[in-house]
Structures are given as structure tokens and as C-alpha cells.
Amino acid sequence: MGFDYQRAVMLQRILSERVLAELDSFPRIDPSRIRSVAGVDASYRGGVQVGSAVLMDYRAKMPLAYTCLTSKPPIPYVPGLLAFREAPVYIKALHRLPAKPDIILVDGHGLSHPRAFGIATHIGLVLSTPSIGVAKKPLYGEVEEVNGRKLVRAHGRIVGEVVETNQGSEIYVSIGYLIRLEDAVEVVRHLMEPGLKLPLPIHLADNYSRSKCIKELRL
């Protein structure tokens, strides 16, 4: 049986209602208590999807472990449904890490999504783990300038922030799941390094998926 796109959209709408209802009860996260974070990303080679997850020491910003695996993309790329294409391989890669991260960073959006259920929210909800969406381009929502901050409003809520990187470019940080926006932005800022367009865990996951994973998997 083929992929049911209408059902996927309906599922996003149903689950996003639950997440938005929980938004104000998401806990604050004390940065001093964060031990490890994970970044996930994927690349494609000859029709094969290569997913990678990197576990990183949060304070030292040093990689602790990485995993990678291949999969056939379950569906083509469809705007708004990226989670159904890439989340399965990310979740499998995360399960293969030697320890569960305190926070997951995803190359993509969270609540700043047309149905408030981007890939970062999808993964965070499935794994019951705080998650953050980080993207180089906007997807959904209006930017409002408040006290010098560029906040992203969508679905009647502030769900993201435009953050300037060390390079002077902008990235779009959004709430995924189980994290407040202020904490998500603080985590992302801590993990940015000079010369990088995305936080270090995502950058390393991207590199692994494009180089070491391909060599190890002999693609």
C-alpha cells in the first residue's frame, strides 16, 4: 500500500494540537545540567539515504560517538512532510548511540511549520526527548522584532527566533518538543562555532553522513 499523504497531514494536525496545548508546560532547562546533546542529518547517494547521529559532550563540545545507517527514502521530498522522509532513519541512528542525549538538534524546523509539526517536533515527541529545530531558511511564520530580538510567530504563538551566527548570517531556531524557546536559543548559541552555518552537532552529523559513513558503508 502506498503512502497516504492526506493521512500524514491529518496526523500532523492532530498531534500538533497536543503539542501546542502542552507548550506552556514545557520545562525550563538548566544548561549546567546538560551533559550531552545529539545532532542528526542525512545525505543522499545514488538514491540511498544515509542518516547520521552524533553524540556530543555539551560543555566540552567534543564528539563522543556517532552512528550511521542507510535506508531507501520512504517517500519523495514533499514540503511540510520532511519528517516522514527522514525521521525514521534519524530515530534508528539515535537508538544506536551508546547513551540517550539530553537534547536533540535537528536540521529542520519544529513548531515553525505550516501545521506546527515539523521534523524536530516529530522526533522529539516520538522519543520523548527535548528537541530543537535549526534551519538556514524560514519555512512558516511571521518575524516580529521585540526588544532587539527577531521572534517567529506562528499559530498564534512565539515558536522560534532568528539568530545571527558568528559569520553574520542568520539561522532559524524553533521549539521542537519539551523545551522553551529561550533555552533552545541558548543551547544553539553555545554550540555555534566560527565558520559554521549550523550548530556543531548538526555540522558533524552532516560531515559524517557525507564522508565517513559513505566510506564505512562502501557506498
Swiss-Prot record:
The keyword Nuclease applies. Keywords: Cytoplasm, DNA damage, DNA repair, Endonuclease, Hydrolase, Magnesium, Metal-binding, Nuclease. It is found in: Cytoplasm. One of its GO terms (cellular component) is cytoplasm. It catalyses: Endonucleolytic cleavage at apurinic or apyrimidinic sites to products with a 5'-phosphate. Gene3D superfamilies: archaeoglobus fulgidus dsm 4304 superfamily. The keyword Zinc does not apply. One of its GO terms (molecular function) is single-stranded RNA binding. Belongs to the endonuclease V family. This is Endonuclease V. It comes from Desulfurococcus amylolyticus (strain DSM 18924 / JCM 16383 / VKM B-2413 / 1221n) (Desulfurococcus kamchatkensis).
